[in-house]
A protein has these predicted regions:
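A boundary/linker detector
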Residues: 1-51, 72, 277-294
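Short, charged surface segments at domain edges that flank catalytic/cofactor-binding sites
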Residues: 22-63, 84-109
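A general structural signal for short secondary-structure junctions and capping/turn motifs
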Residues: 55-57, 68, 103-106, 147-152, ...
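Short, well-ordered loop/turn elements at secondary-structure boundaries
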Residues: 59-61, 72, 77, 107-109, ...
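Local cysteine-cluster metal-coordination motifs and their immediate loop/turn environment
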Residues: 63-69
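Histidine-centered nuclease catalytic patch
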Residues: 69-113, 117, 121-138
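Long, low-complexity, intrinsically disordered segments enriched in glycines and aromatic residues
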Residues: 124-169, 173-175, 186-189
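C-terminal, charged low-complexity interaction regions
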Residues: 172-294
Length: 294
């Protein structure tokens, strides 16, 4: 999972006006679920939120906000973080279905760019521990939710990746709320999907190999310093900087590998401000032939 500053994007006024028009229509049928679902299911309604997908991709350099993968995690969907028609809570061992957050159907701040695998599994799952919002007048910000949210700066930090490519809760105490939320998120989004886990493992091995190479180069430099050796070290550090840049697929895996190495230079590298404009200048977000949204 990667942090996405959703406030960096604002749709056109035309799009916002259309959203308000659709919301007003939903509110006019607030007591008629069948009619609301009919409005949401209309082709024109779905095209409306689908139209933002390319803009959402730009916020993450074309990576799924949950998995940080591109093609590994299938075609992209525009996920409604809070499900629109119905919501499911199965945390008690029993599946409980309630009305969804229909008033957020056309609110772009409820959209998350998701790979199809995770979003297909997530569907209507959205467990709330306390203060569940049930109507437009309720404040969703007061909800104590199970899902970690990529638009919340501290939520991605509640997940870690190990050398096997496995994603796990960073909080190891099973009864702690952060652990419970992380475990729920991993399971409901299948963030340890086999191909995804394998790709993370490959990334880790590559990064670890580069760490060892820098160790070797540094040892040679310390024993017999030269400008050329120093340049080779800096070039290799620049290669690693590219691995942790926001345009790099699964960059969180590379960051985890550097952190696990405990090398002083690696930890210092993680604290650096990434020169995104320079490193990601050649990155182009590919257009998809298949457009999916939920």
């Amino acid at each position: 999972m990667i942090y996405i500053d959703i406030n960096k994007f604002v749709p056109s006024q035309e799009w916002l006006d259309k959203s308000q028009e659709l919301l007003d229509e939903l509110i006019s049928h607030r007591n008629n679920k069948a009619k609301r679902d009919e409005i949401i299911d209309r082709d024109s309604s779905q095209k409306h939120w689908k139209s933002l997908k390319e803009e959402l991709k730009k916020l993450s350099f074309g990576k799924c906000w949950y998995s940080e993968a591109r093609e590994i995690y299938s075609y992209y969907h525009v996920d409604h973080f809070r499900p629109k028609k119905s919501a499911i809570d199965d945390t008690s061992g029993k599946k409980v279905k309630r009305d969804g957050y229909w008033w957020f159907t056309f609110n772009y701040k409820n959209f998350r760019l998701s790979g199809g695998i995770g979003n297909t599994l997530k569907v209507d799952h959205f467990a709330v521990k306390a203060n569940c919002a049930k109507c437009p007048e309720d404040d969703c910000e007061d909800e104590i939710i199970y899902f970690l949210d990529p638009t919340k700066k501290n939520d991605p930090k509640k997940l870690i990746i190990n050398e096997d490519g496995e994603m796990k809760p960073s909080n190891t105490i099973e009864t702690n709320w952060d652990h419970i939320r992380a475990k729920y998120t991993i399971e409901k989004l299948d963030l340890n999907f086999p191909e995804l886990k394998t790709e993370r493992h490959i990334k880790w091995k590559k990064c670890n190999s580069m760490i060892q190479e820098i160790d070797w180069l540094d040892a040679a430099y310390q024993a017999s310093p030269s400008v050329r050796k120093e340049e080779r070290i800096e070039n290799k550090l620049n290669d690693i900087r590219k691995l942790i840049a926001p345009c790099e697929e699964l960059s969180a895996t590379n960051r985890a590998c550097l952190r696990a190495s405990r090398r002083e230079w690696a930890l210092a590298l993680l604290e650096e401000s990434i020169d995104v404009e320079s490193i990601c200048i050649d990155y182009k977000i590919p257009k998809e032939k298949n457009v999916e949204a939920t």
